[in-house]
Amino acid sequence: MLHMILSQRVILLRKYHSSANALVTKSPNSIPELVKHIDSDLIRNAHKVFDEIPELDVISATAVIGRFVKESRHVEASQAFKRLLCLGIRPNEFTFGTVIGSSTTSRDVKLGKQLHCYALKMGLASNVFVGSAVLNCYVKLSTLTDARRCFDDTRDPNVVSITNLISGYLKKHEFEEALSLFRAMPERSVVTWNAVIGGFSQTGRNEEAVNTFVDMLREGVVIPNESTFPCAITAISNIASHGAGKSIHACAIKFLGKRFNVFVWNSLISFYSKCGNMEDSLLAFNKLEEEQRNIVSWNSMIWGYAHNGRGEEAVAMFEKMVKDTNLRPNNVTILGVLFACNHAGLIQEGYMYFNKAVNDYDDPNLLELEHYACMVDMLSRSGRFKEAEELIKSMPLDPGIGFWKALLGGCQIHSNKRLAKLAASKILELDPRDVSSYVMLSNAYSAMENWQNVSLIRRKMKETGLKRFTGCSWIEVRDQIRVFVNADKNNELKDEVYRMLALVSQHLEENECWKDL
């Protein structure tokens, strides 16, 4: 049956190929039409079509190259371009734009630069179509200096070129350059606004992202779309501003109406969970049709429950996903459920999910460093040090300092001296200048009442010039930030603060609340 189908496809292709001469003479668009109809499985034979068409022109050749690019056959695309040159056909701006785009996708910056040089030689580099393709290549694969030079050389750069350069500046944290270019634009499209909002959000400049979104609304020229709101909501999620986030949610309802897509809902699920409001997070999740929910939707719910101390609900959500959908858990899903089990004390369940990930999912890349670290931490916290040590020995990855810190933390809780000594030696071996490692070691030895080693650690810190960072915390009361520094004697309210601290400590001691902390 399969042989018959393949034979029919070959016969059909030969039929198209045999009539190529006639098609060429009738219409300059006939060859692109022919290329468009070639079956994907037989795309290799398009090269034969390219070679044997007697009156091949730049339009036909560009169409063939474009088809190679569409099929992600970038090597063949560059070979076809070379063949075009050998045949003496002069490439136009669309040929260059297509093949330079191919070099960007295949991450071949050397080829991209060669094509740019050839376009310069032919006087096409200043063309906006070629310039946009070269600029995109340099932004993604080379330096912003090259990209800016290309931008300045482009005649009448379009909004795509400007947006690409702005995105490049933001990714490299060159915010002033990005904003200067953005403000100088005579017209800003929604794509450009989205690039700036998303760029700020992705680089941790969340307040600037939200302010840019507000500026967009204030100008009232461009209407935000379904790509704008995930960027703005993600930014407001990162600063956990519940009131502002609800306002953006209301804006999304106003501007999008029924055009809410899965990306908007997923960002809202994550936002409400980060604000500790799992009820509204679940409402947003339930607004999605079952067939709309993707792995990000489920991961957001699992992680939301886990981070908010509702480990059993996180596990239940994971089980519901496995049972009711055809979605395969990814590494984010597995880490979320392990994190939930770890902090909810569900050790057996955590072990079960970890073993399933190892044995059942047939994906060698599913478990990463963080998954093993989470399991080591889980076993160490529960006092199962032998199993933790065996897990580290059986790891396919080289354990880093994070593993040994997790192990040392568990040793500190359960006073396991032998394993603590092993973890301590590994930590100091891997990073002898890490202050937090020395602090952890000192605390671990103190918990085990090993005062000699505590003294040794402190002496070593002093000899190497390392200083422990002073602990501090802060709270917001009536729009004022109050900062508390460890052992602070300079605060004007220090007497009242320490008096209240003593009362709170006494209350916790009398009611045996320490064990819950």
From Swiss-Prot:
User: Localized where?
Assistant: Mitochondrion
GO molecular function terms attached to this record: RNA binding
Give the start-end ranges of region Type E motif: 403-478
**Segments of this protein annotated with the region Type E(+) motif:** 479-509
Name the GO terms of the biological process aspect: RNA modification
Q: What is the lineage of its organism?
A: Eukaryota, Viridiplantae, Streptophyta, Embryophyta, Tracheophyta
N-terminal signal peptide: none
| Protein known as | Pentatricopeptide repeat-containing protein At5g42450, mitochondrial
Query: PPR repeats span which residues?
Result: 57-91, 92-126, 127-157, 158-188, 189-223, 225-259, 261-291, 294-329, 368-398
Does Repeat count among this protein's keywords?
yes
Q: Which organism is it from?
A: Arabidopsis thaliana
PROSITE patterns from the UniProt entry: PPR
Q: Which family does it belong to?
A: Belongs to the PPR family. PCMP-E subfamily.
Q: Which UniProt keywords apply?
A: Mitochondrion, Repeat, Transit peptide
One GO CC term, this protein:
mitochondrion
Q: Which Pfam families match?
A: E_motif (PF20431), PPR (PF01535), PPR_2 (PF13041)
Annotated organelle transit peptide span? 1-23
